[in-house]
Amino acid sequence: MKKTILIILLLIFSCVEHKFFFRVSPDGKYEVEYKAHGDKDDLIDFDFTMPTGRKWKINSTLDETEAESYDYTAHRSFKRDEAFPKTFYNGDSLYFESLLIHPLKVKHSNWLFWETYLFEGKFMGRKVKSKYPLIGELIKDTENPPDGWMKEALEYLLTETLHQSNIEWNTLPIITAELKNWINTDLQAVNDSTLFEEIDYYKSLGLDIIMHPASPNIYNEMDSIFKTLEDELQITLDLIDDNFEFQLILPGILEYTNADSLAGDTLFWLFQLGDYMNEDYIFSASSGISYSGRQKWGIIIMLILVVLFIGIKLRKR
């Protein structure tokens, strides 16, 4: 039973490499180059949507004939302090709450005597441990999937849908009790391989239990909530074996970074789902350029102004 699920999981989780290279110019503008390499289906799914649109210069082998792996590159120039996209998804079939969100900013400040550069971003945590702990174990070791991980996931989807839905107070306890009874009896009696193969059937049974007693007026709301949660879970699972590498070159002298490594003037961050499956994965760096010549002239000008000010005061006396 476990071997069957393992084989299916290994077929599903194919490795994809995502690489971002950021080069920040002294004037605050920055260039971004994205490279992806891996299985075609995993490249075009929604776990990590790739950059698209007219602002990006794109080269791709996705349209070529069958191959073991494919490549996708995208390049774009950003203006000073222009925000980096929180997500590259621009469709309408997924809710924002389901997506992998990656806010990032490159901030440049010019103080005349010095300039500062800040690179700061994060991959928003997926909160796996608090939602479905057994999937956290699966992420850590896909070759040994824990017993009951799909039951736990389905239970979360149904109970959380029930919790978020605007169900009448006198109906909610009844539905909660019925769902709990079904989970503890019927669902628990299903082995992992059967549930894996017939997940749509058991999902429909669970949805019938929580939706049938509720008012038809909130059916669409409940469907939307369940879809949001289900897509969120699917995206998290699809992110298994997606590896990320961020490279960065900042102007000036490096002042702070939490990068994994530094080679020459290039900073590197390497991470995967295990690094953000619960909490945010944060990457940051800052640098500065100090203009000693401007500072000296600034001091001289300041002294001259002070002398002039004192002289004017003395003359008035």
Regions found by a protein language model. Give the residues of each.
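Short, intrinsically disordered low-complexity segments
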Residues: M1-K2, L314
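Sec-dependent signal peptide recognition
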Residues: K2-I8
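C-terminal motif of bacterial Sec signal peptides marking the signal peptidase cleavage site
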Residues: I12-S14
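Start-of-domain marker
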Residues: V16-A74
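Mature, soluble, non-transmembrane domains
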Residues: N59-L303, G311
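C-terminal membrane-anchoring or membrane-association module
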Residues: V307-R317
